[in-house]
Amino acid sequence: VENGPQLHTQSTLSDRAALGQPPEEIAAVLLPGMRDKLLQDGQIDRAALDAIYAAGKAADHPVIRDYAEMTVAAADIKIAVRAQKTGKPLDFLQRALAPCDSLDVEQLAKAAVEGQDAIYSYLQKTAYADAVPVLQESPSAFERWCDNRIIREIRPQQYNPFTVGPLAAFLLARENEVKTVRIILSGKWNHLREEAVRERMREMYRNV
């Protein structure tokens, strides 16, 4: 049954409440399972980032290596920012952050525990210093910044036809175009102002 575990949890919760069991006792029963689920999700995310990075390192072309580096670094930054806002401890960050060449994840983890300003201060010393004002603006602005940076880095491949670079760049650019179309459609469906949609728009691979 598709919703079996969820329905079972809801049933357990309502049954215990109906029997007059105090909320704190209900939470003591249910929360460990929820924590385990969050831990499993974090482990899966970390494994996925490690796999992306390993594949990038093994690639022959710098476009693929640079894409893997940027993808993992951006994910680490987002994890650190979210963890800081939700008060996650250092050991959580040490498990969640995936190592990469452009970030010292141990320093990033410690900065996230220290506070938001510490994250910004650390990033100012890295290749992602220009991401700091974007992060201060909003999470969606940082997402846009990441996508635009990737597009700028792969754009020169248009003029390098005798390697795998143009094909890799084309596939990444097509993914970016699909994301942009979804942003436009979502804005239309949700009746967002044109300015709100435009500020989420990504740069295109070929600016015709």
Locate each region found by the language model:
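Extended alpha-helical surfaces
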Residues: 1-208
